[in-house]
């Protein structure tokens, strides 16, 4: 099989213009002002009565407190975990934020719970946002990468609930950025990514298909070490509770109609439009299979590594049926690799506009909640495929 090429001209010697820099800076300031205004109105970090704001972060902090109290398995018990969330904020509230993470992430939660809720929330973002921003800057290879990273609308989408999208993006982007030069370290980052295993499904397939066994071995070793450490720290009971919770994850996230417009996957889109579960799984499975085949074949070709990395990162978002708006900060990773390619060889006509459109789709979720993230990911994936097919010297895949 051959991934073909064509001769579409690219704009030579692209330079980031001053107006673009100012625009990105303005977007960064706008997001910061939005968060500060939300804080002042009692919509972020702190509620109007001075208690902690109930967002996704209370899930992590409460689970960490249960660990510190000597009851790690209770994080998977909805009744006990909900009581811990109420205690964390000092008041009862209607929503519940369930704990679905593997036991190793309880180690992180327990550290965060060592300080009060609101400072822990702020510290979590203060640590993870720079990790994400430095990763995007490293991928792009230019100081403007910081502005691009922080101007991306996925930043505010992750900051509002205090979620872990920055961590996932930093681990995935860091692994791909280091894979050619530091395979063992890249594998270690992939191993750490198993704290959200549904975003790492493509990695073992791609690594095996392309014969990157050193990365594969490192990722496997770190995954096993994390599992062993959490087993030693929390015992078999916690792992058993986690395994039992897996069936609840699919039942809650993928069968309740109220969730469909919040999830940015092919499965959720079909269900939101009224399609049956069988049709939704069929279409999602088709997209998943096509993505896996294309990305694996691409990684076996002589395509530029930046395009391989971009395809894997975008593919990771397409194949999971379970992806929320805060996870879409990960989309900055494939976008960063495309920007890197554009910086060195010029951007294709419409490429910058496509990246901007994908960003605006994610931002639109604030005003009109819908699966815009899927459309944004599809745009970026299309830009990557276009790049692959116009880039010269891609060897046939046998």
Regions found by a protein language model. Give the residues of each.
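Primarily membrane-embedded glycan-assembly and transfer machineries that use lipid-linked glycans
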Residues: 2-185, 207-334, 339-341, 393-398
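Membrane-embedded alpha-helical segments of transport systems
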Residues: 195-198, 225-230, 351-353
């Amino acid at each position: 099989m051959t991934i073909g090429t064509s001769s579409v001209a690219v704009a030579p010697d692209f330079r980031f213009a001053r107006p673009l820099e100012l625009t990105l800076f303005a977007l960064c300031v706008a997001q910061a002002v939005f968060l500060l205004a939300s804080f002042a109105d009692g919509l972020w970090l702190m509620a109007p009565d001075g208690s902690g704001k109930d967002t996704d972060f209370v899930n992590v902090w409460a689970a960490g407190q249960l660990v510190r109290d000597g009851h790690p398995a209770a994080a998977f018990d909805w009744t006990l975990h909900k009581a811990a969330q109420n205690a964390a904020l000092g008041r009862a509230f209607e929503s519940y934020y369930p704990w679905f993470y593997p036991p190793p992430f309880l180690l992180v939660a327990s550290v965060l719970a060592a300080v009060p809720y609101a400072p822990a929330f702020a510290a979590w973002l203060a640590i993870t946002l720079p990790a994400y921003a430095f990763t995007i800057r490293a991928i792009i290879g230019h100081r403007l990468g910081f502005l691009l990273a922080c101007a991306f609308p996925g930043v505010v989408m992750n900051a509002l609930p205090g979620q872990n999208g920055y961590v996932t993006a930093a681990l995935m982007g860091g692994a791909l950025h280091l894979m050619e030069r530091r395979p063992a370290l890249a594998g270690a980052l992939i191993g750490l990514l198993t704290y959200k295993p549904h975003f790492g499904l493509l990695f073992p397939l791609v690594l095996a298909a392309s014969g990157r066994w050193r990365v594969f071995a490192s990722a496997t070793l770190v995954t096993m070490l994390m599992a062993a450490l959490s087993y030693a720290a929390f015992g078999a009971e916690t792992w058993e509770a986690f395994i039992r919770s897996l069936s609840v994850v699919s039942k809650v996230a993928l069968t309740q109609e109220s969730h469909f417009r919040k999830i940015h996957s092919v499965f959720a889109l079909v269900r939101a439009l009224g399609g049956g579960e069988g049709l939704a799984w069929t279409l999602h499975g088709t997209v998943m299979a096509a993505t896996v085949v294309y990305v694996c074949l691409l990684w076996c070709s002589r395509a530029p590594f930046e395009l391989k990395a971009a395809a894997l990162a975008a593919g990771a978002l397409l194949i999971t049926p379970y992806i929320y708006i805060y996870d879409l900060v990960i989309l900055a990773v494939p976008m960063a690799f495309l920007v890197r390619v554009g910086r060195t060889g010029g951007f294709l006509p419409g490429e910058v506009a496509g990246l901007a459109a994908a960003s605006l789709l994610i931002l639109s979720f604030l005003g009109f909640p819908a699966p815009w993230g899927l459309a944004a990911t599809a745009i970026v994936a299309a830009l990557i495929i276009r790049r692959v097919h116009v880039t010269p010297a891609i060897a046939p895949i046998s």
